[in-house]
Amino acid sequence: MTSAPAVPPVGRGPIVRTIAAELRRVRGDPLPWAFLPAMLFLIVSLLASLPAELGIAPAPAIAEVAVGLSASVFSSLILVVAVLGALGVTLADKAGVLARAQLYGGPVAVFGVRAATTLLTSLLLGGVGAVALETAFLVASGQELLPPATAGRTLAAIGAAGLWGYLVGVLIRSPILVLFVVPATLVPAALLADIAPSLADVLPLQTLLSSAGLAHEGLGGAASAAIACAWLLVLGAAAVLVVRRRDRL
């Protein structure tokens, strides 16, 4: 009587190994937690500038303050999250983490999984910032800062900003350089808002704000969301080309 052939152990595939390694990295990554206090400090500083009599102001006046405050705070939050997304991948590349990870998972798995965790981290930081801002404004004025639908779209815009920074980081791979390049890709929309509003309306920052419903001038939400997606697709295509050439995909 012959015994059944031994079944070879089933090994984990490259994507599973890459996901497991990335989850371990995210749990111990200090970078998001270093940015979180700075982000909360920014929110508290802006709220401290609100007039003390806001709580007894008429509802239209409070709504006007809410519009200006939300646009200002979330513009800054988008910029911070984008820089964080770029720093994560560039610091990993400089430390050799990406090169080592590709020995087991390959570029597609490594960069794809890192993009997903960057998106999730951006959504987490954006959610914490939005809840803190909403709570503080509610206490100060007695009214909500953003309707639930607008808050959801704003969170999506913050997630897109994290991906934007990540893709810029994949292209550049320099932690110092992304501190200047990422803002340079977003800030011009604010600088051109008064000089050339039609041009500013199609730039990345303005399309993200408009898609979230935080900008009450220019293109509508659907058109802005489509343009923002187009920007991400173009940048993503460029990042894929760079990865294919630099990382020998």
List where the protein language model places each region.
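Short, membrane-interfacial amphipathic segments enriched in basic
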Residues: 1-19, 196-202
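Secretory targeting signals
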Residues: 5-12, 30-32, 36-88, 111-175, ...
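Transmembrane helix segments
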Residues: 48, 173-209
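Short helix-terminus and kink motifs of transmembrane alpha helices
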Residues: 87-95, 193
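Hydrophobic/aromatic positions within or immediately flanking transmembrane alpha-helices
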Residues: 99, 111, 179-180
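Short helix-to-coil transition segments within interhelical loops
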Residues: 100-108
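Membrane-interface capping segments at transmembrane-helix boundaries
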Residues: 240-249
